[in-house]
């Protein structure tokens, strides 16, 4: 597995860790994940998924992201956060000759603020910006989720929306004039976008501290993304399942 593909597991790891996290402070596990890319002639990728989660009064860590709490009580949690964004484009991974002539888009580290409010279900929002001078973009995620528990089974459906700044979209989905001349694709300069999504996590606890989990997310891509000549899908998605142990 290449380094860049391993980094693409970040969102799966973070989601899986959150789904598997129970009453304990430290969770370890392993599973498998499938990522569906929106890029033209990109196949779905199947990866092994390590799950790591830690929670304390001052710090938290889930997958490839973590944070420091500025405020942490029963109903409200505000934290400074940083995480590795798994978005990337590797020209050689596409079967399209035109796509193979485009520039590489790199993954990056995003940093910002995260807030969770939990009286009725829970509201989750994060705003973060690129720190490595790759896209110089900003991403804002807002979601509402409701946790339903029946015995050892916990289901958490959610609905949300993701906003990408124009810099973010231009870096990952835009085609420069230089790339257009080299590849034969039309040039494209997208604006900012709103991308709604649905997600579902399931966790079943057995034998005390052991659990099996499943997580999935479906994102409907906006016209600013689907109009890109780099894209041939109207959606992106991920799914993961595995087993964990909570200490």
State what each model feature region is.
Residues 67-70, 131-133, 137-211, 215-225, ...:
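Outer-membrane beta-barrel transmembrane domain signature
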Residues 49-53, 234-247:
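Outer-membrane beta-barrel "beta-signal"
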Residues 1-25, 41, 207:
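Cleavable N-terminal export/targeting peptides
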Residues 28-34, 63-65, 80-86, 125-129, ...:
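Transmembrane beta-barrel strands of outer-membrane/channel proteins
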Residues 47-49, 63, 106-110, 137-141, ...:
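Transmembrane beta-barrel architecture of outer-membrane proteins
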């Amino acid at each position: 597995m290449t380094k860049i593909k391993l980094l693409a597991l970040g969102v799966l790891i973070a989601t899986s860790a959150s789904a598997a996290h129970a009453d304990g402070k430290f969770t370890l596990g392993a599973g498998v994940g499938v990522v569906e890319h929106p890029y033209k002639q990109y196949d779905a990728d199947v990866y092994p998924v390590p799950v790591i989660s830690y929670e304390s009064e001052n710090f938290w860590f889930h997958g490839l992201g973590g944070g420091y709490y500025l405020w942490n009580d029963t109903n409200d949690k505000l934290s400074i956060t940083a995480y590795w964004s798994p978005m990337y484009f590797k020209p050689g991974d596409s079967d399209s000759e035109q796509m193979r002539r485009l520039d590489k888009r790199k993954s990056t580290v995003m940093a910002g603020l995260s807030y969770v409010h939990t009286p009725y279900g829970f509201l989750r929002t994060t705003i973060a910006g690129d720190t490595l001078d790759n896209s110089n973009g900003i991403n804002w995620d807002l979601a509402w989720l409701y946790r339903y528990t029946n015995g050892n089974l916990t289901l958490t459906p959610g609905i949300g929306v993701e906003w990408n700044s124009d810099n973010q979209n231009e870096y990952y989905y835009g085609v420069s004039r230089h790339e257009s001349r080299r590849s034969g694709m039309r040039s494209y300069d997208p604006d900012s976008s709103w991308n709604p999504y649905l997600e579902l996590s399931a966790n079943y606890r057995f034998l005390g501290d052991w659990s099996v989990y499943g997580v999935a997310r479906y994102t409907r891509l906006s016209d600013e993304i689907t109009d890109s000549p780099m894209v041939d899908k109207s959606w992106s998605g991920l799914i993961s399942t595995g087993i964990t142990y909570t200490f």
